[in-house]
Amino acid sequence: MYELKEKSYPMQPRERLELLGEEYLSDVELLAILLRTGRKKYSSLNLALELLQHFGTLDNFRKASISELKEISGIGQTKAIELRAMIELGKRIQTTTRKRYGQVLSSKEYGMSLAFEMQNFEQEHLTATYLDGQNQIIEKKTIFIGAFNHATASPREILYHAVKNLSVGLLVAHNHPSGNLQPSQADKIFTKKIKNACDNIGINFIDHIIVGAGNYYSFRERDSNLF
């Protein structure tokens, strides 16, 4: 069994979370925080590492029963129950989020929904919608408000949140306050940049939708060369 040394983690997980934010911690560090303690001569980091190595994947860990968790030395009845409670709470939070946001069934349905949602926006808004494998919406995020410069726009922030959310699919949308739905050349270039970036990291770029005057334009529906 590989053992983590203190020098591998110059700061303890709680300190790193407070300083950097939880998204910068490894799976081992996050689990170590939840475990709080290890066992004799064995830190919580080492116990967390052993747990994850034993089950192989986070999905297998998620499915582990109390008795299966207790097979690991240092995981007693109390810790096993606490871990199961943590896993169940995470599942319920995810389910609540999905119920709140709903599911994307088609570009038409979602385009018309966005057209209604953004119809009174006087400034241009760029939004990103992140989906799981069943097209359930994980998060809807406003990326930019104002005179959006497509020429200098980078997919980086959009994809940062996609990776953070473990997204399988991505929809991007922006409004034209003028009501003119026709995409500019800059819109087309931006769409291609996002599509290429998604392809490079294995995320399904579902569509780029333009909305205005109560209607929508779908690149997927209208521009087959891009999709």
Curated annotation (Swiss-Prot):
Name listed for the protein in its UniProt record: UPF0758 protein llmg_1515
For this chain, the family text in UniProt reads: Belongs to the UPF0758 family.
**Among the record's GO biological process terms, what is one?**
proteolysis
**Which residue numbers delimit the MPN domain?**
103-225
Q: Which Gene3D superfamilies does the entry link to? A: 5' to 3' exonuclease, C-terminal subdomain (1.10.150.20), Cytidine Deaminase, domain 2 (3.40.140.10)
The entry's Zn(2+)-binding residues are: H174, H176, D187
What NCBIfam families does the annotation carry?
A: PRK00024.1, radc
